[in-house]
Amino acid sequence: MSHDSDDKTFPYEKDDAELRRRLTPMQYEVTQHAATERAFTGEYTDTEDDGIYKCVVCSTPLFESGSKFHSGCGWPSYFKPLNGEVIDEKVDYSHGMVRVEVRCNHCGAHLGHVFEDGPRDQTGLRYCINSAALNFESRPENE
């Protein structure tokens, strides 16, 4: 599933050759072709450090560690994005399912999907995100 056929345009212009040089093959396939890394293999699945998760393509801050929770699904899960402006949602009909795809609203990178089975005491949502779509920036301990 490539984003090339999508009508939406994003502010950050991506150069494919530059992305192929800069990203790992998994990061490229996940963000540019909506691939999914295998469950429980991602770098940030169990990360509990305090900080911000950013888009691996354009460095837009997407999620903060305070919204991360252990869902048991095998991918990093968050109950909300950093704010309502950073995420683009699109209905995804791939693989014989109807899901809601989550993309970076700045560059269009595929991040994962959002489901309505998150913590009920929060938003009730579970943003199920590929580690390969993220970079983590820890906060200094004195902040």
From Swiss-Prot:
Signal peptide: none annotated. Pfam families: SelR. Its cofactor is Zn(2+). GO terms for molecular function: peptide-methionine (R)-S-oxide reductase activity; zinc ion binding. Zn(2+) binds at C55, C58, C104, C107. Belongs to the MsrB Met sulfoxide reductase family. This is Peptide methionine sulfoxide reductase MsrB. It comes from Burkholderia lata (strain ATCC 17760 / DSM 23089 / LMG 22485 / NCIMB 9086 / R18194 / 383). The lineage of its organism: Bacteria, Pseudomonadati, Pseudomonadota, Betaproteobacteria, Burkholderiales.
